[in-house]
Regions:
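Domain-scale recognition of functional cores that engage charged ligands
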Residues: 1-174
């Protein structure tokens, strides 16, 4: 039997019986099993909100408000363009940032690195941001570390991103 699951599927695609009948990645009956208490989700439906780029800029304030303390590991700074100060900051520092939609929609725009765009691409991105500023977030660029990786029969240095999660237990975080 399974006690706890860690989802790697979009919320909307978790259960084709209850959520999206066209979803191929989900587990039929998952929502019913969760409702009935037969399985727990380590990252419950709806928890993707916390990983939303639009929410990232508010995580330090949420931690202070809910926990009364600062984050042990800082989040990358981000600025929501739906606020006038955020929009002006993002447009003024466009080449120093990564720009991404507040909510990632399958088939929709992903993230943009403005300094890598040609003039036409950059202008198009600025126009999209100005047209619907609340849909966009600017985030500081995270310089990635490199680690040895196996590629084509040889070891090469390649960029690596490591995402870690912690779980709260009665004995403390694990």
């Amino acid at each position: 039997p399974i006690d706890v699951l860690l989802r790697r599927v979009l919320d909307s695609e978790c259960d084709p019986l209850e959520l999206d009948s066209g979803a191929l990645a989900g587990t039929p009956g998952l929502v019913q099993a969760v409702r009935g208490g037969r399985v727990a989700l380590a990252n419950p439906l709806g928890s993707a909100l916390v990983e939303s780029p639009g929410f990232m800029g508010y995580i330090p304030a949420v931690a202070r408000r809910l926990l009364g303390e600062e984050l042990l590991l800082p989040s990358p700074q981000s600025w929501w363009c739906g606020r006038p100060d955020g929009l002006s900051h993002v447009l003024a520092r466009l080449d120093d940032l990564v720009v991404e939609p507040v909510v990632t929609i399958p088939g929709g725009p992903k993230r943009y690195v403005p300094r890598l765009l040609d003039a036409a691409g950059r202008t198009a991105l600025v126009d999209r941001i100005r047209a619907r500023p609340g849909d966009w977030v600017g985030r500081e660029v995270i310089e990635r570390s490199v680690a040895p990786c196996w590629d084509g029969g040889r070891v090469v240095a390649a960029p690596v991103v490591l995402r870690l999660f912690s779980a709260a237990t009665p004995e403390g975080p694990i």
